């Protein structure tokens, strides 16, 4: 028994160093558990790649069954083959006319007859004026009233007098009154 150390304690027999033996056993168990975890991860990775291989095989079988192998380009992807076979739509190129870029005032002033004949109405014609609704309508009635007063008082009409409006005071905006004023 030359090569055997007689003084070395045997595991499980109890010896002088019982705590060291227990520590080595717990370390060995931890290594086995880590190995099992790593083995479980390896098994999951292998199952994942097997699943991918099965999916590729099924796609290949499907494309061969439907006759899409040539259109797929050999990679077994029938969907991309259909996309390549589809014709591209031409780009959208709208046709513009100069009428599309004219201002409302120019279109209403110059093309009233054209708009009436073609059945198209401009925004100005639809709103009944300049597009400001009630304010435009109010100005129109004031002008009509002034014109009616001018017709009644033709004999007494004096030179045009400049009068400022009471409700809408805008600098530089003046209204010419027809007829005499009592002030």
Swiss-Prot record:
Primary location: nucleus
GO terms for cellular component: nucleus
UniProt feature, compositional bias: Basic and acidic residues: 135-145, 163-183
Protein name: NRR repressor homolog 1
Family: Belongs to the NPR1-interactor family.
InterPro entries recorded: NPR1/NH1-interacting
UniProt source species: Oryza sativa subsp. japonica
Gene: RH1
Subunit structure: Interacts with NPR1/NH1. Interacts with NPR3/NH3.
Skewed-composition ranges (Acidic residues): 31-40, 101-115, 150-161
Function as written in the Swiss-Prot or TrEMBL entry: Binds to and represses NPR1/NH1-mediated transcriptional activation of LG2 in vitro.
Region of interest (Disordered), ranges: 1-40, 66-183
Gene Ontology biological process terms in this record: defense response; regulation of systemic acquired resistance
Coiled coil: none
Keyword Kinase applies: no
